[in-house]
Regions:
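Short linear regulatory motifs enriched in tryptophan with gly/pro/ser
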Residues: 1-248
């Protein structure tokens, strides 16, 4: 991220995010510099939720609802009926490419500020892997100016709970099934899941903020190279992705 070469001279965006359609909640609260692209925001989210950059992703921004929220923040006394006459398109999608002429979209490599994040409460959704149907709901909590904060500290996670996703497990329903199987730790289904994942333990309640902040300074760059330049990870990067550093 460019912001690491100096102080955080750009606004800092603080988001609350949550894996949709899954209980117990898997969530993250995090901060990013305001000069990143929507794609970079995606790489940060993918890192935090254990997504392995093996599927396409996009963002949906409810621009009409967010703009109404912004107008309310500017003028809390403005009548609701006047706000709802706003005629902008309801949803803007940020994607790498688009084959559907009926949707309003922008390149996902556009700067994040193009999504018109202006006040607390604005929302967006990240979708990953259309087959499994993972969705991460995000809410902008705050826009901060902290010129004393070294840019190298961003992005950073402030808090969270839960492990994240397991690739190609069938979405939230499959993740819940995996959680149940590994909790029982017995039977043929458990043995099959162990072989498939290559592990005998799976704690979907675990979250290590220190480890995640370490990964957030490194992995988003690897994902950027994969999606934007078609560069496959080196063995060193693969070792990082697989947390081989924890086994030393």
């Amino acid at each position: 991220m460019k912001g690491e070469w100096g102080m955080a001279s750009y606004p800092i965006y603080q988001f609350y995010s949550e894996l949709c359609n899954y209980e117990p909640k898997i969530w993250r609260r995090f901060q990013v510099p305001g000069n990143i692209t929507m794609a970079q925001l995606g790489y940060i989210i993918m890192t935090m939720y254990e997504m392995q950059a093996s599927h396409l992703f996009d963002f949906s921004v409810p621009s009409r609802d967010n703009f109404i929220l912004y107008l309310k923040a500017l003028n809390p006394n403005q009548e609701e009926t006047n706000l709802t006459t706003f005629k902008n398109k309801e949803i803007i999608q940020y994607k790498f490419q688009n084959d559907d002429i009926d949707i309003l979209w922008e390149p996902i490599t556009n700067k994040m500020k193009s999504a018109f994040f202006s006040c607390s409460g604005e929302k967006l959704t990240m979708k990953y892997d259309n087959g499994d149907g993972w969705e991460i709901g995000l809410t902008l909590e705050n826009i901060i100016m902290d010129k004393e904060l070294p840019g190298r500290e961003l992005p950073r996670v402030l808090g969270g709970a839960g492990y994240g996703i397991i690739e190609d497990c069938g979405g939230p329903g499959g993740l819940k099934q995996l959680a149940d199987v590994f909790q029982k730790k017995t039977g043929l289904e458990y043995e099959d899941c162990c072989k498939w994942l290559g592990r005998q333990e799976l704690d979907l309640l675990s979250f290590d903020s220190n480890d995640m902040n370490f990964r957030l300074k490194k992995i988003p760059r690897i994902y950027r190279d994969i999606y934007e330049y078609g560069v496959q990870p080196t063995q060193r990067s693969i070792n990082l992705l697989e947390r081989k550093y924890l086994k030393r």
